[in-house]
Design a protein with these regions (language model features):
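Substrate-binding cleft of extracellular glycoside hydrolase catalytic domains
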Residues: 1-111, 115-117
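Functionally critical loop-and-helix segments that line ligand-binding/catalytic clefts
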Residues: 2-5, 137-195
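Hydrophobic anchor at the start of a short beta-strand
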Residues: 47, 120-121, 144
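Short beta-strand/turn micro-motifs composed of small residues
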Residues: 51, 125, 148
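Glycine-rich, charge-decorated loop segments at or immediately adjacent to ligand/cofactor-binding or catalytic sites
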Residues: 60-63, 129-139
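Short, solvent-exposed loop/turn segments at secondary-structure junctions
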Residues: 93, 128-130, 151, 168
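Basic/polar, cationic surfaces and motifs that engage anionic cell-wall
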Residues: 102, 123-124, 135-142
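Aromatic-lined carbohydrate-recognition surfaces of secreted/lumenal glycan-active proteins
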Residues: 114-132
Length: 195
C-alpha cells in the first residue's frame, strides 16, 4: 500500500508544528515540497523533512542520504532552517525482509550521513516494524517517530520515542491533502521547552 502525502497552507493557530514531507518516489522530489516548505515558514509552522526509503543495503542508504542532502542544498535549506529533524522513513516490506541486522545497518548508515552534514536525524517506522526489524540498542541515539493507530494512550513499543503518529484519518480545516485526511502526531518535548 503506497501513501501519497501533501500539504497546503494551515495557520499556526490551527497547528503548532508540522513536518514538511519530502517523499522519494523513483528518485523524484515531492512536487509540492517547495511550496509546502515555504508556506510553512511564512506561517511560522515548525518545519522538518522526511525521506521515504527503498534502501536494502548500506550502500543504497548512503546514496539516499546524499540524495536527501542534495535536495536540501538545492533548496537552500541548512540545519538552522529546520525546527524538526530529517526523518528516515523506512517501511517497505522488501527492506524488512532483509533482516533485523541489515535494516538496522541501513538505518544507521542513513542517519549517520545526515548527522555528519549537521542535520538532526530521526527514524520513522510503524510500531510493529520497530519492534521486529530494528536493533534498538543501535538506533536509540536517534530520535524515534513511531506510527501506531490505536485507541491506547501510547504506541505499543517497549522503548522510548520522540514522536507518535496516532492517526491517518484526521480532518483539519485548511489542510488540502487531496485525500481528505491528514496524519496527526504528538511530538514529545521537555516540559521546560520554551518556543
Amino acid at each position: 500500500l503506497k501513501k501519497k502525502w501533501e500539504m497546503d497552507y494551515i495557520t499556526k493557530d490551527t497547528l503548532k508544528g508540522w513536518v514538511v514531507l519530502n517523499e522519494k518516489r523513483a528518485g523524484r522530489k515531492d512536487s509540492k515540497f517547495d511550496t509546502n516548505f515555504r508556506n510553512a515558514g511564512y506561517a511560522s509552522i515548525h518545519r522538518g523533512v522526511y525521506y521515504y526509503s527503498y534502501a536494502k543495503t548500506t550502500s543504497d542508504a548512503k546514496k539516499e542520504a546524499r540524495h536527501c542532502l542534495k535536495l536540501l542544498k538545492e533548496q537552500g535549506i541548512d540545519p538552522t532552517d529546520l525546527d524538526l529533524p530529517v526523518a528516515f522513513d523506512i517501511e517497505e516490506e522488501a527492506v524488512f525482509q532483509t533482516g533485523r541486522r541489515n535494516v538496522t545497518a541501513v538505518t544507521t548508515t542513513f542517519c549517520d550521513e545526515i548527522k555528519k552534514a549537521g542535520f538532526e536525524p530521526m527514524v520513522y517506522s510503524g510500531a510493529s516494524a520497530l519492534r521486529n526489524y530494528f536493533e534498538y540498542s543501535k538506533i536509540r541515539e536517534y530520535k524515534i517517530w513511531v506510527a501506531h493507530y490505536t485507541k491506547a494512550s501510547a504506541p505499543a513499543i517497549p522503548f522510548s520515542y520522540d514522536m507518535w503518529q496516532y492517526t491517518s484519518r484526521a480532518v483539519i480545516n485548511g489542510a488540502n491533502t487531496g485525500m481528505g485526511y491528514c496524519d496527526l502526531n504528538y511530538y514529545l518535548v521537555d516540559k521546560n521547552y520554551k518556543e
